[in-house]
Amino acid sequence: MSHYLQINGQRLIDSLYALGEHGALPGGGVCRLAATAEDKAGRDFVVARMKALGLSVLIDAIGNVTGVYHGEETLPMVMMGSHIDTVATGGLYDGNYGVMAGLEVIATLQDAGIRTRRPLAVTFFTNEEGVRFQPDMMGSVVFAGEYPLAQALAAKDIDGITLDEALRNIGYKGERQPGDMAVDSYVELHIEQGPILDKEQIDIGVVTGVQGISWQEFTLRGVSNHAGTTPMSMRRDAGLAAAKIAVFARELALSLGGNQVATVGHFSVKPNLINVIPNHVVMSVDLRNTDNAILCLAEQQLAEFVAKTSQEEGVEITSRSLVRFNPVIFADEIVNAVEAEAERQALSYRRLPSGAGHDAQFIASVCPAGMIFVPCVDGISHNVKEHSAAKDLIAGANVLLQVVLQRAQRMD
């Protein structure tokens, strides 16, 4: 019976729209920053759904919430999940899809009278987006033991409120130690957040791993002076030096090729006046690659160019690392299972790495982990126009259902 089991597609879509009402923006989309009143409303909605399904709800000290559907045997659980916090101009699907699809999987099994050998669980992790508190993916990195709980709870937002205070304010500061549960495996269903599947008209992305990420912030200090009277040869122009670094970052990515990407996403210039040479710039460079050796090479070449530019332009440049995550390769057993199930269901598929960071990359250090992608229209995400077709959302959830069912019922 389970071989042909399918999720209730309309129930899944309805649940996504219902969750999207919490923090809904007037023009569409969602703003549900971590540990805000809007996040509390979203959390309450999901927890109510968990309880309606009879799940045991566990909340840990970083605010991660897990709903457990107990199995026939006391064994490590097969976990699904993602996050429900959003960016300030978020869509309905990023993160939310993986959480609600996980609950739909359990609802479908209950409808069919199936209780799996291993327990099933759905977790939503705190502060995946990292908008209000840094770093991003905070709940999962603490769960995996790769970031100190105390340090995470001490993180402050722009108003000086700590995450600890914010979680207490919304009633989601649990007592359990993060990661204090036996997890057999983890499968995260997610929209791609990129254009490949949509452009190639492919149903399922079989995610092989997550790119390594290097975020660096550069502060450049030059000398402000009159834009008309200062000869070009006598300038210490922080704006020019920053522009050269930005151009080099693009050229670096193109020269290294492969999966290397580079982005200058933040650029702040002072005094920011049309007739004054800039004396102060703060800028970011985001480097990513699936190959850690090449990512390290990119970091090295960028550092060398920055030092050279500082000397040539007479501009003091300091740097600090904001984020550094190594690439993650997902477990073959999960990757192969996703691929086989897509083929069995006659869905088109391709293997690809994730260009964005996800909770799965940290849970992969705890247990075998993997991800399933579905297309999003034009690759648009972190945007109120984010959209995935219902047929794609349903197809992805049906693949998740079967992969998780196989994991939970296996006899090894």
What are these regions, as identified by a protein language model?
Residues D60, R115-T116, G174-G179, T229, ...:
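Flexible, glycine/charged-enriched surface loops at secondary-structure junctions
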Residues G63-V65, I84-T86, L120-V131, Q193, ...:
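Acidic, glycine-rich active-site loops and adjacent beta-strand->loop/helix elements
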Residues N127-E128, R132-N292:
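Midchain, well-structured core segments that form catalytic/ion-binding scaffolds
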